[in-house]
Amino acid sequence: SMSIALNPNKIDHVGHLGPAITGGIGAMLNLDEETIYQAIQYSAHTSIFTRQGRKGDLSSWKAFAPGLVGRNAIDAIDRAIRGEKGPSPVWEGDYGIVPILLHKENENIEINLPEKNGPRSGILSTFTKEHSAGYHGNSIIDLAFLLREKIKDLKEIKKINIYSKKYTHIVMGSGSNDPEKYSPEASRETLDHSAMYIFAVALEDGFWHHETSYSKERKQKQETIKLWKKVETFEDSDFNQRYYNEKDPLKKVQGAKVEV
């Protein structure tokens, strides 16, 4: 829920995934409300990490963090079934996740839950990725596909400026201040969150593949490196407004403007 937003406070979003998995397992097992409640609190407490795992010199932690909180969720259910309780109240308590880690007043938080047996609003508002790259970079790949039809010789390009919303700029773009996002030695976990890399490769190839687009041979091509270094991102107020001010998740503008 954006009403308990982890990202602005540099907390990894798997902090939501752990409790969500726990709730799902509890529902599948038809457990009673109190057992699920305690399991969710236990899971929430063991699923909070900083976003450093997604910044700087990345390791396989980024890839396996969802699996870890999934394991924590199973453990939480198992312990709750056996009578163990979680830290309570884990979110809104005086020393809980919200006041200590998220720095928000408890009374300002509103959580919209689906009606019983009603549509699962959280799932239905999810933006599904078409390409195997960062959430905020999918539209950039599509833009590269469109632009490559209009550019006769990529070697003549002097500069590429990408204007988009804040998250694209600071999470995947040059606004992250991560030099690794420009490095041909960077890991796949880094490059799938480099708007500069994915735009350059998509512009050259005209397709995106979940493995070959990140291979050592692909990322170390000299022509690609030259093009890659010419790409820079910028935060754009218009895209910010059309993304952050839109209440309907499926109507949020995900795109960008590209100047070549």
Language model region names:
Residues 1-71, 75, 87-94:
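Glycine-rich, mobile lid/loop segments that gate access to catalytic sites or pores
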Residues 61-71, 78-260:
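Terminal-appendage/accessory-domain detector
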